[in-house]
């Protein structure tokens, strides 16, 4: 056990990661040595930033807490703190069932942790973070919470109503991160589309991205988690105008069937969804759309699933993920629908939709062979440098693999790369020029 050292373990999404990065910076400013996601826990204090979104994530968080609880009983750590979405959602229950935890903090009161340790939260560092990602890219969380209340989703139950971060705060954070070497900003929120409504009375995502794009040193801006209903169309000319705004949009559509969309409380129709996609592609030529779909939601019969299959084949999304519905405690769907679709049927539907997407992805990727693209290098191993194009977000999208042999590239730098081969999930290339 190392005195005056704190280990922070982040579970779940990139939004959680940003919270951990802000907390690490505060701990450092208060004199602590901090390690993020250590291979071996040896700090006298351990903080677990939990995820509570879906059942698998909840179980992962609980397993981690139990493991660290055993380490505490063995005297390997002195204090165990738990924060984040799981703690926010199930605070009372966790306090009763996990007495080995010294204190639970929710999603928004983690600043109290500093006070409990006899330290103070430093407001002048509110825009500063310790980057846990490679130093050339960062996630920028522009809001917290969601006002949409989709039937299947527990996020509003955890994070509450939509709360935007003031634009000045975000722009200062971007400038700080640029000064630390960040070139690529992945803009994230539960609902990008609603940014600014609560603070400024109107959707301000276009203004925010326009101002970010003008900051010297910002090479790439990528948008994650837009909402299709009340989509801020003014963002499209901003994307088309600025070369450093990636032609990429992550927008979760969930389904195509009007019946299922209505059950999901998405407040959009299939026809409106198709019009949205067509307009995005028309106004931002070359854009790659990433979406997420759900199979097995209550009301999805064979007709509705076949509608989804036809939709995927027609829309030909450049990037797509999918998952099978699982009932979440407290949601509208859990209260009002019976989850009666057998799990094996859900699994078969998921496999089918992803097989179709794999074929589409293979065709789209193959068309890149012979072309030259701007690629940022993320990492290297004994065989390949791993990089990404503007259409590829960290962790979730295809990589560009460049042989180490006869190449000497710098991590975090951009290169012109000719694509020589492709699979649905990878591109292979060589540096040119």
Q: How would you describe each model-predicted region?
A:
Residues 261-264, 332-336:
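Short acidic, glycine/proline-rich loop/turn micro-motifs
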Residues 189, 225, 253-255, 291-295, ...:
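Active-site proximal loops enriched in glycine and acidic residues that flank catalytic Cys/His/Asp
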Residues 79-84, 89, 94, 179-303, ...:
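Conserved SAM/AdoMet-binding glycine-rich loop
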Residues 150, 170, 187, 223, ...:
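Conserved, mostly hydrophobic/aromatic
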Residues 1-195, 234, 249, 271-278, ...:
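Proteins enriched for Cys/Gly/acidic motifs involved in redox and nucleic-acid/cofactor modification
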Residues 333-433:
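Terminal RNA-binding accessory module
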Residues 111, 148, 193, 258-259, ...:
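Glycine-centered loop/turn positions within well-structured domains
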